[in-house]
């Protein structure tokens, strides 16, 4: 490097570095804090092929939450990119096989506090980096309508298991479509919430400006109900959130009159869709119009570059979070 150091300088630097290394040694001896785990649980088991015919499950367990709450009587699956204390978590990848979190993600704690019952971890794509359903190291997750086809990804298991009725609801994750795509392909309701509405604390990051957790269910009401439970500030644990904000009762808003509501359809969004998908969206828009809403096409030219922009952000973010960091 072209540096010239005298023996005296080297001695000073060596003494300085030695002190720094002692600090690292001390840190390695410290016992890290452990978060309390509120509800009794056992580790569960890896399901046999007969227990997971679509390969939708990564791990089966049975964790009962509070005796009463908004989710009382509801069964829920958690995408395997989200931590559940004491339950193995692989995130679809051989890299994490054998890892067992010691904490519950915030959304998991909220579900249990609301009386939900967790039945297991749902399979997802390898590090959540695929929109289809064939990259999980345990094998592909099959589409419940046609087992020769993909269930979509990366929240593949969540969508497939919700459709079959093995669970009432599921938590999915979405960066560039990972809730919406499998929900569409399996025929359920999936929502990517407003950025920062649902805390991401305790889930594997890909890119902090793209990461979302959201609800998946067989109908809009249950999707809204789960969103009510998991939304809200997380005590500054998620830096993307405001310190305080109001969470509406979304289930009550389902009864809101549509008269006077303004809804925009992005015209560029239809350019890459198959015709039958376009038809379904337009039929839905017509139903909203009949209910009194004003539905209009709106042009956002930059939307055409959305895939390119999202891919670049996602790849660089994934490199920083997954390869340079520890994904948490």
Residues of each region from the PLM?
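Gly/Ser-rich catalytic/binding loops embedded in alpha/beta enzyme cores
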Residues: 4-175, 291
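Amidase signature
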Residues: 2-71, 229-328
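Generic structural signal for helix capping and beta-alpha/helix-loop junctions
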Residues: 127-128, 178-179, 305
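Fold-level recognition of mixed alpha/beta catalytic cores in primary-metabolism enzymes, strongest
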Residues: 22, 26, 32, 132, ...
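Short, basic, helix/turn surface patches
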Residues: 143-155, 196-203, 319-328
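A structural signal for well-ordered alpha-helical segments within the folded catalytic domains
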Residues: 105-109, 220-224, 316
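Short beta-strands and strand-loop turn motifs
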Residues: 87-91, 120, 206-208, 264-267
């Amino acid at each position: 490097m072209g540096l010239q150091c005298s023996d005296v300088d080297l001695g000073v630097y060596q003494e300085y570095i030695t002190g720094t290394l002692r600090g690292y040694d001390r840190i390695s001896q410290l016992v890290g804090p452990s978060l309390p785990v509120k509800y009794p649980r056992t580790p569960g088991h890896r399901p046999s092929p007969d227990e997971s015919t679509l390969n939708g499950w990564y791990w089966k367990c049975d964790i009962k939450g509070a005796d009463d709450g908004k989710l009382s009587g509801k069964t829920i699956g958690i995408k395997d990119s989200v931590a559940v204390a004491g339950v193995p978590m692989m995130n679809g990848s051989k890299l994490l096989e054998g890892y067992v979190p010691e904490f519950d993600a915030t959304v998991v704690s909220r579900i249990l506090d609301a009386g939900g019952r967790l039945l297991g971890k749902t399979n997802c794509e390898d590090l959540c980096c695929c929109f289809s359903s064939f990259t999980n190291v345990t094998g592909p997750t099959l589409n419940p309508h046609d087992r020769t086809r993909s269930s979509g990804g990366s929240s593949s298991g969540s969508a497939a298991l919700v459709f079959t009725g093995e669970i009432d609801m599921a938590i999915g994750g979405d960066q560039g479509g990972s809730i919406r795509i499998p929900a569409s392909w399996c025929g359920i309701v999936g929502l990517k919430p407003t950025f920062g509405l649902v805390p991401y604390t305790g889930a594997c990051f890909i890119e902090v400006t793209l990461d979302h957790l959201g609800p998946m269910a067989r109908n809009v009401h249950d999707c809204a109900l789960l969103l009510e439970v998991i939304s809200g500030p997380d005590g500054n644990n998620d830096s993307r959130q405001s310190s305080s904000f109001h969470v509406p009762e979304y289930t009550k808003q389902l009864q809101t009159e549509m008269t006077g509501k303004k809804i925009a359809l992005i015209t560029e969004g239809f350019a890459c869709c198959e015709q039958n998908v376009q038809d379904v969206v337009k039929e839905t828009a017509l139903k909203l119009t009949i209910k009194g809403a004003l539905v209009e096409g709106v042009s956002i030219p930059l939307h055409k570059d959305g895939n390119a922009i999202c891919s670049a952000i996602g790849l660089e973010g994934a490199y920083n979070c997954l390869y340079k960091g520890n994904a948490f």
